[in-house]
UniProtKB/Swiss-Prot annotation:
Belongs to the bZIP family. ABI5 subfamily. It is found in: Nucleus. PANTHER family: ABSCISIC ACID-INSENSITIVE 5-LIKE PROTEIN 1 (PTHR22952:SF395), CAMP-RESPONSE ELEMENT BINDING PROTEIN-RELATED (PTHR22952). The modification Phosphothreonine is found at T143. DNA-binding heterodimer with AREB3/DPBF3 or EEL/DPBF4. Interacts with the AFP proteins AFP1, AFP2 and AFP3. This is ABSCISIC ACID-INSENSITIVE 5-like protein 1.
Length: 331
């Protein structure tokens, strides 16, 4: 059997001519658990972490817990620094600065958070119909010291739950349909059709670290780890939703912006019309007041002229009386 495995890829490619059965492939999956994943700080229980750090996490709040946790992570990296190969990268735990803790969660202690998790499990108990649900129920009934750090952070809401990809193999290509794997037809450099089954391991994929894997037949193999701005975009895309929903939200936002702009223009236009009407009213009132002032001025002038004429008549009459001849003596 030929296995093409990328150094950091999450996919294994199997030859079509030597397809294993489903139990054999499941056994291979359990045996091929990454060494970095087993030795990762995420796979340790809280009791093991407390033994390494020498501190009790129960009475700590979540901020202190993460701060002490990073000290343990650095010590674990120093101890097992040479154990990891260059091609194997364990599950990456985000730095404390990149973890967004809600304000109520920062003030709570680890024991209080665990009590809320247990209360949530009791309020929503899993059904015991399938074996997977039964195993999950047993795992949820663990104590605080027995639970792994990864499960605790996921249940507490500090880290998003790992994305597990399960792909089914095409029955038309291989004649059977196992629980995992997908039929992939890729053509090599010699232009010969080569059907290979590709299955994805259930490795953790946190939103802080984006990972993309690609399969190339022949002599070329390509894989890439996305960090920085690409990881932030992937995290934002996961939080916001698929592109269709984002496009619909963008269109609704554009429609709302246009409606808001139209309402603003209508308000400005109505305000302008109101100002123009008020200006016209003030202009008409000013014209009427000017006419009234002119009429009053004319009346005042006419009164002044009539009074001046009357005064001149009175003065002329007084002069005639003074010039009248006086009566002479009788002798």
């Amino acid at each position: 059997m030929s296995v093409f495995e990328s150094e950091t890829s999450n996919f294994h490619v199997y030859n079509n001519h030597e397809i294993q059965t489903q139990p054999q492939m499941q056994t291979f999956l359990s045996e091929e658990e990454p060494v970095g994943r087993q030795n990762s700080i995420l796979s340790l229980t809280l009791d093991e972490i407390q033994m390494k750090s020498g501190k009790s996490f129960g009475a700590m709040n979540m901020d202190e817990f993460l701060a002490n946790l990073w000290t343990t992570v650095e010590e674990n990296d120093n101890e097992g620094g040479g154990a990891h190969n260059d091609g194997e990268k364990p599950a990456v735990l985000p730095r404390q600065g990149s973890l967004s803790l809600p304000v109520p969660l920062c003030k709570k202690t680890v024991d209080e958070v665990w009590l809320e998790i247990q209360n949530g499990v009791q309020q929503h108990p899993p059904s015991s119909n399938s074996g997977q649900n039964s195993a999950e129920n047993i795992r949820r009934q663990q104590t605080l010291g027995e639970i792994t750090l990864e499960d605790f952070l996921v249940k507490a809401g500090v880290v998003q739950e790992p994305l597990k990809t399960t792909m089914r193999m095409s029955s038309s290509d291989f004649g059977y349909n196992p629980e995992f794997g997908v039929g992939l037809h890729c053509q090599n450099q010699n232009n010969y059709g080569d059907n290979r089954s590709v299955y994805s391991e259930n490795r953790p994929f946190y939103s802080v670290l984006g990972e993309s894997s690609s399969c190339m037949t022949g002599n070329g193999r390509s894989n890439q780890y996305l960090t920085g701005l690409d990881a932030f975009r992937i995290k934002k895309r996961i939080i916001d939703g698929p592109p269709e929903i984002l496009m619909e939200r963008r269109q609704r936002r554009m429609i709302k912006n246009r409606e808001s702009a139209a309402r603003s223009r209508a308000r400005r236009q109505a305000y302008t019309v109101e100002l123009e009407l008020e200006l016209n009213n003030l202009t008409e009132e000013n014209t009427k007041l000017k006419e009234i002032v002119e009429e009053n001025e004319k009346k005042r002038r006419q009164e002044i002229i009539s009074r001046s004429k009357q005064v001149t008549k009175e003065k002329s009459g007084d002069k005639l009386r003074k010039i009248r001849r006086m009566a002479s003596a009788g002798w």
